[in-house]
């Protein structure tokens, strides 16, 4: 219900929406990481919006599990995926007990997951996220099949200039 409420609130201000079913520090979201839940979320979402929807998927241990999740998204028009969220970390020293590791160390995993998903689903729109910290890495992901990129940690450490560096490099 909360997802639908937010879609109704924000759809007039967006050109697309991301539904994050994989935040590692939100315990209840794990229940959505299966094909039936994804199908249900998308079915209900399509009743209230025609905006493109991107489902942000978790970083999974068994790469073949992406097949099941992505097949559920393909039953709906204008649905893509975001690969992938942070790497889940559980540690009692964290104030909430769990969270997600981000940054450069995730890049190789992101690239592997992207290559697998692109080969299995050549038509799906893929936004790629995870460990992108240089123009070369951005180019590698785009050449491997990402349609667009999301950059978080590099933006924090490098500032907005990283976006300009990546864009300048890609335009050459």
Sequence positions of predicted segments:
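Generic structural signal for well-ordered alpha-helices
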Residues: 3-11, 35-46, 66-71, 111-114, ...
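Glycine-rich phosphate-binding active-site loops on the catalytic face of alpha/beta enzymes
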Residues: 21-23, 79-87, 132, 138-165
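Hydrophobic faces of well-ordered beta-strands that scaffold small-molecule active sites
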Residues: 17-20, 53-55, 81-83, 117, ...
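Active-site beta->alpha loop and helix N-cap motifs at the rims of alpha/beta catalytic domains
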Residues: 1-18, 23
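Active-site glycine- and acidic-residue-rich loops that bind
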Residues: 1-4, 30-31, 51-74
């Amino acid at each position: 219900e909360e997802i639908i409420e937010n879609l109704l609130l924000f759809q007039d201000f967006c050109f697309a929406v991301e539904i994050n079913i994989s935040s590692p520090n939100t315990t209840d979201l794990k229940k959505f990481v299966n094909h039936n839940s994804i199908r249900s979320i998308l079915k209900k979402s399509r009743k209230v919006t025609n905006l493109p929807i991107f489902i942000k998927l978790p970083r999974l241990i068994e790469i073949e599990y992406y097949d099941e999740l992505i097949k559920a998204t393909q039953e709906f028009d204008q649905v893509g995926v975001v690969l992938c969220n942070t790497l889940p970390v559980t540690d009692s020293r964290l104030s909430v007990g769990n969270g997600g590791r981000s940054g450069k160390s995730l890049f190789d995993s992101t690239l592997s997951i992207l290559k697998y998903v692109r080969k299995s689903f050549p038509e799906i729109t893929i936004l790629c996220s995870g460990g992108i910290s240089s123009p070369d890495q951005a180019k590698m992901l785009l050449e491997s099949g990402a349609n667009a990129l999301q950059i978080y940690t590099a933006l924090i450490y490098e500032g907005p200039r990283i976006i300009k560096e990546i864009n300048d490099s890609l335009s050459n």
